[in-house]
Curated annotation (Swiss-Prot):
[4Fe-4S] cluster binds at residues 53, 56, 61, 89. Predicted to be exported by the Tat system. The position of the signal peptide cleavage has not been experimentally proven. InterPro entries: Asp_de-COase-like_dom_sf, MopB_CT_Acetylene-hydratase, MoPterin_dinucl-bd_dom, Mopterin_OxRdtase, Mopterin_OxRdtase_4Fe-4S_dom, Prok_Mopterin_Oxidored, TAT_signal. Its cofactor is [4Fe-4S] cluster; Mo-bis(molybdopterin guanine dinucleotide). GO terms for biological process: L-dopa metabolic process. This is Dopamine dehydroxylase. It is an enzyme of class 1 (oxidoreductase). Involved in drug metabolism, as part of an interspecies gut bacterial pathway for Levodopa (L-dopa) metabolism, acting on dopamine produced by Enterecoccus L-dopa decarboxylase. Removes the para hydroxyl group of dopamine to produce m-tyramine (3-tyramine). It is possible that dopamine dehydroxylation influences the multiple side effects of L-dopa administration linked to dopamine production in the treatment of Parkinson's disease. The gene is dadH. It comes from Eggerthella lenta. PANTHER family: TRIMETHYLAMINE-N-OXIDE REDUCTASE. The keyword Hydrolase does not apply. Induction: Up-regulated in response to dopamine. Although all E.lenta strains examined are dopamine-inducible, less than 50% dehydroxylate dopamine. Intriguingly, this is due to the presence of a single-nucleotide polymorphism (SNP) that results in an Arg-506 to Ser substitution that inactivates the enzyme.
C-alpha cells in the first residue's frame, strides 16, 4: 500500500499554502457574507463566518469558515456551537479542497458519445440546457405519462433532499429513488407507523446516564450528536453499551460490548425486551397509559376498523383485531378501544361506573368523526396546564449555559382506572358470541419470551449472561428519583440494512418506550422543532400555491404492489423495482431521470442499476463533480458547495440547535444553488410556485426571507384542553400565524443576528414544544402536522390539535401495529416486532460451503462520507484504497497478509479490496468498505466495478415492508488477488489502458487535485 505520508502537521502546512494561494486572487463580483458585512477588511485580514458544516452530509456541526480577500482558506470548529462542542473533523477541514477542486463542475454540459462510453462532454449554455430538459421531459410525459419520469436524490447539498418532492409534483410522477430508503428512512418509516415521525433520534446531547450506541460509530461522523459530542457523552455516562459486530473506536472503552453476529440485531433487541419484562424494569404507568399494551386482542373475530389519515393527509382504512365498542355493540364507535380495568369494582363502589362493567375504553377518534371525546379515556378528567406541572429537568452533565428543559410530572389516570396488562377475559360480541380476549402486552410478552437470552445467545453469538447483564444495566434506573429512564437508544444505520429493517426499528422503539425513555431527558425525542424550516420552507413541496399530483398518480407508484406499506408511506418508490422497470418496461416504461446527488451505488445491486442508467432515454444530473453515475447522464448541471450558499438550519435530530448555513464565498463560474435551478425549471414549465400574483416564481432572496418569517417573539398559536368527566372543551391561545411579527424581517437580518449570537437553543425558542418533555402528555407531540412539523403561515397549516397522545391510529405508541396489521392481513406475526434470519447468511443451507464468511459493510471512515471525497488529496492520501477487515487467524487460513489485494466474491459479483488484519472482527466475519470508486479512472463509470461492494448483493433480497436492500450479513468467499487471477496481471485494479488506480499515499497524481483558484469567474 505504501507509506501514509500525510500528518497533522502536513495538513496544517497545506492549509497555509492554500491560504496564500487564495489571497493572490481578487474577490468575486457577487455578494457573500464575508464581502458584504466585512467589506472594510483589507490586505491579508481574515473574516470568520459562522455557518453549518455539511462535510459529512448529515451532522449540523457549527463551524467557522475563514475567508481572506473573498477566498475561503480553512474551516475551524465553532466552540460556541453547543451541539458539536467545536468539533471540526477531517471531512470538514477538507471542504476547502472540495470547494476549490480543479475537477469541480463549472458549466452545464451535454454528452456527445453513446452511453456506456466516455461521455465526451461539451459545454452548453444554461438556456440550452434548461430548454432541452423541458423539451425532453414534456415529450416523454406526452408519450408515456408523468410516471415515466423518475426523480432521484441523495444526501447533503443542503436543500436537494427535497428535490424529488418538487419534481414529483411538477411532473406528476409518483416515482422517486431516495437514499432515504436505506439511510434513516426505515427508522422514520417504522416510528411514524408506531409512535411519531423520526422518534429514532435520541437526545444524546443531554448526556444520558446510560449511553447505548447501537450499530454505528457516531464518534467519526453522522447524526446530530457525533464526533466530539459522542466521545464526551460516552465518557460522562455511568454506563456505556456498544452493540456492534466489530470493535468500533469507542467500543473498546465501553462497559459492555455486545459483539453480535451481523444481522441479528432484532433477536438481541427482543432478548433485551424479555429481560426488561421478566425483571419488571418497565415503566408501568407509561405502558398502561401511553401505549396500546392494555388494548384487548380478539382473535375470534374478523378485523374491523375505521378510516384514518395517511402521512400525506389522504385516508386509508384501519382493519384490526383490537377490540372496539363497535365489535360488542351495534352502532358502537370503531374508535373506542376496550381495556379491562383491574380497579372497576373499587371505582364502582366509589360511584364511578363504566358503561361496560369491568371494561372501559379509550377513544382514538382523533379527527372528531363521531364525537369530540377522541384522545381521552371514558370519564377522564384532564387539564393541559395540569399536564405541564412539573420541574426543571436535572441532567447532571450539561454544558455550561445549556438549557435543561421542562419536565412535567407523570400524570396518573383520573379516574384511577388500572388497565390490565396480563390475564384473559371473556366478553360477548354484538353477534352474541362469547369470546376470550387478552391484552396486547400478553402477546408482546410471549413474543419476547421466544428470544430469552439463552435463545438469543445461539442466534447472536453473545453469551446469555452478557445479554442479560447489558439489558439489566440499560433497564435499571441509576437514579429513580428522576422519574424517567437512563436514556434512549441511539440505534443507527446498521439496523436498517437487513430484510428485517422495519421490524428491527419497531423493536427499538418499543424498548425505549417501555423503559420510560420516550421524550424524556436523554431519551428519544425525534426531530428538533423550531419555527424556521431547515429545508427551506418555500423551496419544498409544501410551498405556498404548490399543486400536488392527484391521488390516482400516487397509486401508480412503482413497487407498491410488492410492498403495500409503501402506499401508506408514500415518500419513496422502491428503487429495485424502478431500475427493473427501466430495463423491462414492467409495469410501465420509465424513460427519464432527474437526479440531485443521488448515487446508484448506495442500494440495490450496482450492476443492475448501472444497466438501467445506461438504458434511459434522457437523464439530468445536478452535482459538484463528474461521478460514476452522471457518466450515464445526457445533461449535467453544476451546483454550489455548502460554503457557497444560504439556508436556514435546525438540527434534523434531537440536538435542539437552530442556526444557518451561510454563504461564505461565491460559487465558481456558472454553478448555481439547487433551488434556483428547480425554480427556473418550474418557470419554464409554467408550474406556479406560489399563488401570489406577479411572484409566481420567486427568487432566492424571497425564499430565504420567507423561511424565517415565523421566528417571532410572539407566542405561536397553541391549544389547551380541559376535560371533565369525559366532556372536553378547548381554548386557542397565542398569535395566529398570519398575524405574527417576524423577529427578523429579512434573511440578512437573521444571518447578522446568528453571527453575533451563534447557535440558538430550540428549548428557548419553543418552550412549550421542544423545551418541554413528555409532550405526549401535554399535547405538544401533536402540536404540528403529523410528519414534518412544518408550519405554513399563509393558511394556518401545520398546526395540530394539541391533544395528548401520539399520531398513530390508536393515538398510543403502538406495540401492536395497526398499520402493519391492516396492510399485511396474511402475516399476523408482523403485528408485533419479529426477528428474521438474514437471507444468504450462515444459516442458508449448503451455501455456506462455497461462501463460508459473513460479510458486513458500511462502517464510518474518518476521511470519507459514503462515496464522497475520493478526489480530495488530503483524504485520499490518508486512505488511498478500500480496506477489508479480516481477523488475522482467518487471513492466515487463506494465505492473506496485511496489505494484500483480495478478491471477495458471491454468485452476484466480485470485487477487490486491500486486506487489513484486525482482531476486532470475528473469525468468520469480514468487514468491507462501501461505495468506492476511483475519480482518477477516466473510463465510463470511473472504476466503480473494481471495488463497489453492492455488486455482491442479491438485487431482490429486501425488507418486505420498506423495500430496503439487504446490504449486510451475506455469505462470501475470499482469496488473494495474484497476477495470474487479475486483469493486466496486476492485483491492483487498472483502467482500460492498464494504468493502476491511485493506491499509495505518495502517488504524484494526488497533487493534480490540489486547490485551484483560476477559472471560477
Amino acid at each position: 500500500m505504501g507509506n501514509l505520508t500525510m500528518s497533522r502537521r502536513t495538513f496544517v502546512k497545506t492549509a497555509a499554502i492554500t491560504g496564500a494561494a487564495a489571497a493572490a486572487f481578487g474577490a468575486s463580483t457577487h455578494t457573500a457574507l464575508a464581502e458584504e458585512t466585512y467589506s472594510s477588511v483589507s490586505g491579508n485580514d481574515t473574516v470568520a463566518v459562522k455557518t453549518c458544516c455539511r462535510g459529512c452530509g448529515k451532522m449540523e456541526c457549527g463551524v467557522k469558515v475563514i475567508v481572506q480577500n473573498g477566498r475561503a482558506i480553512r474551516v475551524e470548529g465553532d466552540e460556541g456551537a453547543f451541539q458539536s462542542m467545536g468539533n471540526c473533523c477531517t471531512k470538514s477541514q477538507s471542504s476547502i479542497q472540495a470547494a476549490y477542486h480543479p475537477d469541480r463542475l463549472h458549466y452545464p454540459m451535454k454528452r456527445t458519445n453513446p452511453k456506456g462510453e466516455e461521455p465526451g462532454w461539451q459545454r452548453i449554455s444554461w438556456d440550452e440546457a434548461m430548454q432541452s430538459i423541458v423539451d425532453n421531459f414534456m415529450d416523454i410525459k406526452a408519450k408515456h405519462g408523468g410516471e415515466a419520469i423518475a426523480c432521484q436524490v441523495g444526501t447533503s447539498r443542503i436543500w436537494c433532499m427535497h428535490s424529488e418532492s418538487i419534481l414529483k409534483n411538477m411532473l406528476e410522477t409518483p416515482n422517486n429513488v431516495e437514499a432515504w430508503q436505506i439511510c434513516k428512512g426505515p427508522r422514520h418509516f417504522a416510528t411514524t407507523m408506531v409512535s411519531q415521525f423520526a422518534m429514532s433520534w435520541m437526545e444524546t446531547i443531554t448526556r444520558p446516564k446510560v449511553y447505548v450506541q447501537w450499530g454505528g460509530a457516531s464518534e467519526l461522523s453522522n447524526y446530530d450528536d457525533s464526533c466530539r459530542t459522542t466521545v464526551d457523552v460516552a465518557s460522562r455516562a455511568d454506563v456505556h453499551i456498544s452493540v456492534d459486530p466489530r470493535m468500533a473506536n469507542m467500543g473498546k472503552e465501553a462497559d459492555y460490548w455486545q459483539h453480535l453476529r451481523p444481522g441479528t440485531d432484532g433477536a438481541l433487541a427482543l432478548a433485551w425486551t424479555n429481560v426488561i419484562i421478566e425483571k419488571k424494569l418497565y415503566d408501568e404507568l407509561y405502558v398502561k397509559k401511553w401505549t396500546n399494551a392494555p388494548f384487548l386482542v380478539c382473535e375470534d373475530m374478523e378485523p374491523s376498523g375505521f378510516p384514518t389519515v395517511r402521512t400525506d393527509g389522504s385516508y386509508w382504512d384501519v382493519k384490526t383485531a383490537l377490540l372496539k365498542e363497535s365489535d360488542i355493540k351495534e352502532g358502537g364507535s370503531p374508535y373506542k378501544f376496550l381495556v379491562y380495568d383491574n380497579n372497576w369494582e373499587k371505582l364502582k363502589a366509589e360511584g364511578v361506573e363504566h358503561e361496560y362493567g369491568a371494561f372501559t375504553w379509550f377513544n382514538a377518534d382523533q379527527e372528531g368523526v363521531i364525537d369530540e371525546t377522541g384522545g381521552f379515556w371514558e370519564g377522564e378528567n384532564y387539564d393541559s396546564e395540569k399536564a405541564r406541572q412539573g420541574r426543571e429537568a436535572a441532567q447532571d452533565n450539561l454544558l455550561p449555559g445549556q438549557t435543561q428543559g421542562w419536565l412535567p410530572d407523570p400524570m396518573p389516570f383520573d379516574p384511577a382506572i388500572d388497565p390490565a396488562l396480563e390475564g384473559e377475559f371473556e366478553i360477548t360480541l354484538k353477534d352474541g358470541k362469547t369470546v376470550k380476549v387478552k391484552p396486547v402486552w400478553e402477546h408482546y410478552k410471549a413474543r419476547a419470551a421466544e428470544y430469552k437470552p439463552e435463545v438469543a445467545a445461539e442466534i447472536t453469538g453473545i453469551p446469555a449472561s452478557e445479554i442479560e447483564a447489558a439489558a439489566t444495566a440499560y433497564g435499571t434506573r441509576i437514579d429513580p428519583s428522576t422519574g424517567y429512564g437512563n436514556g434512549g437508544i441511539q440505534y443507527m444505520l446498521a439496523v436498517e440494512h437487513f430484510c428485517s429493517a422495519i421490524q428491527n426499528c419497531r423493536a427499538f422503539d418499543n424498548l425505549v418506550g417501555i423503559t420510560g425513555n420516550m421524550d424524556t431527558p436523554g431519551g428519544n425525542r425525534g426531530p428538533t422543532i423550531v419555527p424556521i424550516d431547515g429545508d427551506l420552507q418555500g423551496f419544498s413541496a409544501w410551498a405556498p400555491g404548490a399543486t400536488t399530483p392527484p391521488e390516482e398518480v400516487n397509486r401508480k407508484q412503482i413497487g407498491i404492489d410488492k410492498f403495500p406499506l409503501l402506499g401508506w408511506w408514500q415518500y419513496w418508490c422502491d428503487s429495485h423495482s424502478l431500475w427493473d422497470a427501466v430495463i423491462t418496461g414492467d409495469p410501465y416504461p420509465v424513460r427519464a431521470l432527474w437526479n440531485e446527488s443521488g448515487n446508484f451505488m448506495s442500494q440495490t445491486n450496482t450492476t443492475r442499476a448501472w444497466e438501467a442508467l445506461c438504458s434511459l432515454d434522457f437523464y439530468v444530473d445536478l452535482n459538484l463533480w463528474h461521478t460514476p453515475q452522471n457518466d450515464t447522464a445526457d445533461i449535467i448541471l453544476p451546483v454550489a458547495h455548502w460554503i457557497e450558499l444560504n439556508s436556514p438550519r435546525a438540527s434534523q435530530g434531537s440536538a435542539g440547535a437552530m442556526g444557518a448555513t451561510v454563504k461564505c464565498v461565491q460559487p465558481p463560474a456558472e454553478a448555481k444553488y439547487d433551488p434556483e435551478i428547480v425554480m427556473d425549471l418550474a418557470r419554464r414549465m409554467n408550474w406556479k410556485w406560489t399563488d401570489e400574483p406577479g411572484n409566481e416564481w420567486p427568487d432566492i432572496n424571497w425564499q430565504l426571507d420567507d423561511s424565517i418569517k415565523l421566528l417571532t417573539d410572539d407566542e405561536l398559536t397553541y391549544t389547551t384542553w380541559h376535560v371533565e368527566n369525559g366532556k372536553p372543551t378547548f381554548e386557542r391561545h397565542g398569535v395566529p400565524m398570519a398575524e405574527v411579527t417576524p423577529k427578523y424581517k429579512t434573511w440578512d437580518e437573521y444571518v447578522k443576528a446568528f453571527q453575533e449570537h451563534g447557535w440558538w437553543q430550540a428549548k428557548d425558542i419553543e418552550p412549550r414544544n421542544w423545551g418541554t418533555y413528555r409532550r405526549y402528555q401535554t399535547g405538544a407531540m401533536r402540536a404540528r402536522d403529523r410528519v414534518w412539523g412544518r408550519l405554513d403561515y399563509t393558511a394556518g397549516k401545520g398546526i395540530g390539535d394539541w391533544k395528548p397522545g401520539w399520531f398513530t391510529p390508536t393515538m398510543k405508541q403502538e406495540i401492536w401495529s395497526t398499520v402493519m396489521e391492516s396492510h399485511h392481513p396474511d402475516h399476523p406475526e408482523w403485528r408485533l416486532p419479529t426477528y428474521t434470519e438474514p437471507p444468504h447468511g450462515p444459516k442458508d443451507g449448503d451455501r455456506i460451503k462455497e461462501y463460508p464468511l459473513t460479510a458486513t459493510t458500511g462502517r464510518r471512515i474518518p476521511v470519507y462520507f459514503h462515496s464522497e471525497h475520493r478526489q480530495l488529496p488530503w483524504c485520499r492520501e490518508l486512505w488511498p484504497v478500500p480496506r477489508v477487515e479480516i481477523n488475522p487467524k482467518t487471513a492466515a487460513e487463506y494465505g492473506i497478509e496485511q496489505g494484500d489485494w483480495v478478491w471477495i466474491e458471491t454468485e452476484w459479483g466480485k470485487i477487490r479490496e486491500v486486506a487489513d488484519l484486525y482482531y476486532g472482527v470475528k473469525e468468520d466475519v469480514i468487514n468491507l468498505e462501501h461505495t468506492w470508486w476511483y475519480p482518477e479512472v477516466k473510463d465510463a463509470g470511473h472504476g466503480w466495478q473494481f471495488s463497489q461492494v453492492n455488486q455482491l448483493i442479491d438485487h431482490y433480497a429486501q425488507d418486505p415492508h420498506s423495500g430496503t436492500s439487504n446490504l449486510r450479513a451475506y455469505q462470501v468467499k475470499i482469496y488473494k488477488a495474484t497476477p495470474e487471477n487479475s486483469p493486466f496481471n496486476n492485483p491492483v485494479p487498472c483502467d482500460s489502458t492498464g494504468t493502476p488506480i491511485i493506491h499509495t499515499s505518495d502517488d504524484p497524481r494526488l497533487k493534480e487535485w490540489l486547490p485551484t483558484y483560476e477559472g471560477r469567474e
